[in-house]
């Protein structure tokens, strides 16, 4: 439960920090086709942060091993990258940099999933929706960047 709370808290903090900047995405920017309504994002992210936390908890509860430690470090790294992406995209509106940052996050996610798989298969499977959403987010980020230059 602690891992779920940690994940949700990071997401909530990022949301709180950029709350005054999110309006630009909703109103002032040209968004790419398939952009979901704004209400979808907090719902999806709440579920994804819960899945992240459940996966991390399963890893944490696994027997100590170098793979477990690596998995937890990767979890922390991707959570950090996830947090800062919101700040880069919404607060600074640095859409190109945000896309590069998101590509790095995507790589970390893929690496984390592979690391999780070596420790707990279910923990790894719980991260696939996150990777898929990050892929969709990259499409949206790219679209916003290209359409609003």
Regions found by a protein language model. Give the residues of each.
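Membrane-interface loop-to-helix entry segments
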Residues: 36-51, 92-105
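N-terminal signal-anchor transmembrane alpha helix
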Residues: 1-17
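Membrane-interface helix termini and inter-helical loops of multi-pass transporters
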Residues: 20-34, 148
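Interfacial loop-to-transmembrane junctions
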Residues: 114-132
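Final/C-terminal transmembrane alpha-helix of multipass membrane proteins
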Residues: 126-145
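Helix-adjacent hinge/juxtasegments
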Residues: 50-86
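Hydrophobic alpha-helical segments of small multi-pass membrane proteins
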Residues: 75-85, 99-112, 130-134
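Membrane-interface helix caps and helix-loop-helix hairpins in membrane proteins
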Residues: 85-97, 145-149
